[in-house]
A protein has these predicted regions:
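Conserved ABC transporter NBD signature motif
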Residues: 57-65
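Conserved catalytic motifs of ABC-family nucleotide-binding domains
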Residues: 155
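ABC ATPase NBD coupling module
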Residues: 12-13, 66-82, 183-185
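Helix-to-loop junction immediately C-terminal to a conserved catalytic motif
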Residues: 49
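Short helical segment in ABC ATPase nucleotide-binding domains corresponding to the A-loop/adjacent helical element
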Residues: 97-105, 115
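Conserved ABC ATPase signature
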Residues: 134-138, 142
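Catalytic Walker B motif of ABC-type/P-loop ATPase nucleotide-binding domains
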Residues: 159-162
């Protein structure tokens, strides 16, 4: 599903954020991506989503070389990838339910199908009562859960999540991880970036550790 070959990412003359990273993630795997702040976790996820391009090296996602994608090829690839980044990127002029269902709308699903799937995801995350609210009326934690519901609604081939439980209490954290594990059991490849050591201890999965832009362990 994911292959990185000698990937380096640098900005200007600064030290590389990622340096000579080699990584392989098989289809259907669940992996933790961990390391201290500034280790390169978010940058790696952004490269996988084609939000940025590597300075050198090659990246394959779903068998496609992202370095060689045309301008039209990036949106096509992203149809099979869902992301949860720390800035959430909710649409301010759309309701919560419309935000969640946006990926299905892009795929051409019917209004009834979109509404039903969106409400089910919101119900799983305790946000059914907020379905017709605008994002500005929600707390930061609620907005975070909306972003997670949006990422899961279309059952993507690949889910990339950057600190998806960072601002949530233990109960909500467990609920969200159950949803991520369920998506993984259904075939979604899941990559979750976190610096929460307690999560890694409680939910043991393959863990790739970064430090100063390099992979220092993979177990």
């Amino acid at each position: 599903m994911i292959q990185l070959f000698h990937v380096t990412k640098a900005y200007g003359g600064d030290a590389p954020v990622l340096s000579d990273v080699n990584l392989r993630v098989e289809k259907g795997e669940f992996i933790w991506l961990t390391g201290p702040s500034g280790a390169g976790k978010t940058t790696l996820l952004r490269l996988l989503f084609c939000a940025e391009a590597p300075t050198s090296g090659q990246i394959l996602v779903g068998g496609r070389n992202v370095n060689r994608l045309s301008q039209g090829g990036v949106p096509y690839l992203r149809r099979n990838i869902s992301v949860v980044f720390q800035d959430f990127k909710l649409l301010d002029n759309r309701t919560v339910a419309e935000n969640v269902g946006f990926a299905l709308e892009v795929l051409g699903a019917s209004d009834a199908h979109i509404r039903g799937r969106s409400l089910r995801r919101l119900d799983q995350l305790g946000l059914r009562s907020k379905a017709d609210s605008l994002p500005a009326r929600l707390s930061g934690g609620e907005q975070q859960r909306v972003a997670i519901a949006r990422a899961l609604v279309n059952e993507p081939a690949l889910l990339l999540a950057d600190e998806p439980t960072g601002n949530l209490d233990a109960s909500l954290t467990d609920s969200i991880l159950e949803l991520l594990f369920d998506a993984n059991a259904r075939g979604t490849t899941v990559v979750v970036a976190t610096h929460d050591r307690a999560l890694l201890s409680r939910y043991r999965r393959r863990t790739v550790s970064l430090d100063r832009g390099k992979v220092v362990s993979d177990a």
